[in-house]
Amino acid sequence: AGTPFEHVALKDVSFCVERGEFIGIIGHTGSGKSTLMQHLNGLLKPTDGSVLLDGQDIWSDKRLTKQSRFRVGLVFQYPEYQLFEETVYKDIAFGPKNMGLDPAEIDRRVREAAGFVGITEQQLEVSPFDLSGGQKRRVAIAGVIAMEPDVLILDEPAAGLDPEGREDILKNIDAYRKSKNATIMMVSHSMSDVARLSDRLLVLNGSELVIDDTP
């Protein structure tokens, strides 16, 4: 039975995503953007409907659910608050280590991910807590990129950064997309960023997908 507090966070939301697309997602606070993102990489399980990755329901098998969390990378808003390791290198390596990769492959991924976001070799050996806010943001994004996800979902990746830092982060994200033919799904309140970068725009309102079109 329903309760007085029950709320449908997403209603009749259906769309397909192609490899290599850059998709902008916009909507007012409470429109369902964060809920949508967390469904796409298996953090939340839909009470109705399904999430398909390469045509397979990610909840049909525990192995597929686990794989989806590596293949669909999720960067929360202000991800720098989730840094915890003693060096930048170790923080970026955390995800690849959890994937069970060998040390040489982990090292390759860490250095490549650092390169994508503009982290230098010298910075890899310092504490992430000694870096500026913008640099911490880069480290946090690199930690997800190092898992080489097919789909990279980002919640306001440029929030709180100065104009130069904002532009750098967005360029880094697009460079990853082009290099790996990855799909980017980016939540943003900046219509100019979305219009400039996206191939496609999803607009959520009142828990429903109201627009799915080119910007």
PLM-predicted stretches and their roles:
Residues 41:
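Helix-to-loop junction immediately C-terminal to a conserved catalytic motif
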Residues 206-207:
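Conserved ABC ATPase "signature" C-loop
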Residues 50-67:
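ABC ATPase NBD Q-loop/coupling interface
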Residues 152-155:
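Catalytic Walker B motif of ABC-type/P-loop ATPase nucleotide-binding domains
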Residues 194-196:
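A short, surface-exposed alpha-helical micro-motif characterized by mixed small hydrophobic
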Residues 127-131, 135:
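Conserved ABC ATPase signature
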Residues 104-122:
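Conserved ABC ATPase "signature" region
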